[in-house]
């Protein structure tokens, strides 16, 4: 009798907390996010402390400011996508030390991870107001964040190459 009861209980519980595969579109955008996140974090760790102040020309951001800008944007954009309040801001203007910028980058990517964690297929397709004209889906905003991160990773790659460093995406 116990065997029958346990079998019934297991069958009943199997539907309650059943694993749901992630939405394919969300999983695709998340995979791209993981790629750019890894490259940026590796680059931030790889660059020596003294190069964080490096500017190829006086009128562009320093390498450290680029990392701060990426962190600020991650918080702002992923906050828009998730509907959550950003936990940090002002990083580009307030932080210059490598350890502080690496910590801020890590925190910003963790914040974006939480935006992805709550992104079901239905939620991903909800339209929201964003800083760009028109309306955008939550997932579209996360895709925009990926594009923004890749844009500035490209800047980081150029700065690294100018200083004779091989960026993470080119390392074997």
Protein language model features and the residues they cover:
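Short leucine-rich amphipathic alpha-helices used at interfaces
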Residues: 22-23, 29-31, 95, 101
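Acidic/histidine-rich alpha-helical segments that form the ligand environment
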Residues: 43, 95-129, 136-152
């Amino acid at each position: 009798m116990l065997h029958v009861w346990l079998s019934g209980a297991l069958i009943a519980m199997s539907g309650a907390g059943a694993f749901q595969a992630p939405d394919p579109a969300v999983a695709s955008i998340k995979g791209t996010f993981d790629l750019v996140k890894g490259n940026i974090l590796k680059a931030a760790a790889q660059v020596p402390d003294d190069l964080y102040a490096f500017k190829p020309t006086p009128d562009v951001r320093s390498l450290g400011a680029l990392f701060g800008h990426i962190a600020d944007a991650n918080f702002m954009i992923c906050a828009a996508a998730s509907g959550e309040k950003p936990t940090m801001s002002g990083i580009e203007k307030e932080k210059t030390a490598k350890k502080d910028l690496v910590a801020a980058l890590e925190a910003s990517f963790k914040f974006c991870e939480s935006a992805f964690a709550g992104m079901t297929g239905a939620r991903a397709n909800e339209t929201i107001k964003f800083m760009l004209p028109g309306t955008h889906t939550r997932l579209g905003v996360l895709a925009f964040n990926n594009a923004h991160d890749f844009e500035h990773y490209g800047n980081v790659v150029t700065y690294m190459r100018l200083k004779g460093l091989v960026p993470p995406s080119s390392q074997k």
